[in-house]
């Protein structure tokens, strides 16, 4: 389709150019033909002037004055017909030829008069050379007609580009649908746990066995199963065990005779769930650890053997609540 349109535009442009050229040639020939038609009239006028010029020469004796008078008329007639492109050779040669046989004895200035007429008509000869110049404006409209021809050719691909532009958004939705994250499964609640505390001597020292034994007994611990001490529901050792106390050094057992016994520390632990209220049992366990540490001159540590902090105590309580909820 685009090629057909381009061929049509080229043909139309060529026809327009040929039409302008033909019109230019026709107008130039028309002007030239009109100029040739006017020439016989001009020649008749020039002959009449020559005849009158000859008659005046025969009647008048003052040749010099007549020549001056006629010289003034001849250039006037030449200036009137300059625009009509007169040929100087044909118009002024007859008077020159007629003047030579009739007045051969006259003064030589006669030869100077015709040369003055010869260069003057040369001026109109140059004027028709400039007349073909109007053909130039005829060629100017040809250029704007040829220029618009490529414009539709360039404008035509634009819709093609626009047609491809909507294709881009079609390929744009490349991002794959993001899979929804799987719901995070709740962490299974603990159904049992062990709460651990340590009572240790200061760095570089050990706990004395005799002082340790007295403090353990004052806290309500009784020597029992697995050769360790237990804290029962009743101070006399009756009822279920709430929490227990073992040696920090392996195998973790004690000898009832602790006079010569030393150790870097002891470990108190409670298993959850346990008998009764686990939170109340935890408070009792913490009080027992603080009492022993005060008696032997030690410190209370957590399960990582670091200084016990309020944050760690709250963490122990949260674990106990979690276990209670799991077993509720």
From Swiss-Prot:
What is the recorded membrane topology of this protein? Single-pass type I membrane protein
Give me the Cytoplasmic side stretches, as residue ranges: 28-328
Q: Which GO terms describe its cellular component?
A: cell division site; plasma membrane
**What InterPro entries does UniProt report for this protein, alphabetically?**
Cell_div_ZipA (IPR011919), ZipA_FtsZ-bd_C (IPR007449), ZipA_FtsZ-bd_C_sf (IPR036765)
Q: Where is this protein localized, as stated in its record? A: Cell inner membrane
Q: Which SUPFAM superfamilies match?
A: Cell-division protein ZipA, C-terminal domain
NCBIfam families reported in the protein's UniProt record: septum_zipA
Where does this protein have compositionally biased stretches of type Acidic residues?
Answer: 51-63
One GO BP annotation is: FtsZ-dependent cytokinesis
Q: Where is the composition biased (Low complexity)?
A: 99-115, 123-171
Q: What does the subunit comment say?
A: Interacts with FtsZ via their C-terminal domains.
Its function, per the record, reads: Essential cell division protein that stabilizes the FtsZ protofilaments by cross-linking them and that serves as a cytoplasmic membrane anchor for the Z ring. Also required for the recruitment to the septal ring of downstream cell division proteins.
- Give me the ranges of the annotated region Disordered: 42-186
Keywords (A to Z) from UniProt = Cell cycle, Cell division, Cell inner membrane, Cell membrane, Membrane, Transmembrane, Transmembrane helix
Name assigned to this protein: Cell division protein ZipA
The keyword Cell division is annotated on this UniProt entry: yes
**Protein origin, superkingdom:** Bacteria
Q: Where is the chain membrane-spanning? A: 7-27
Source organism per entry reads Escherichia coli O139:H28 (strain E24377A / ETEC)
Provide the family line. Belongs to the ZipA family.
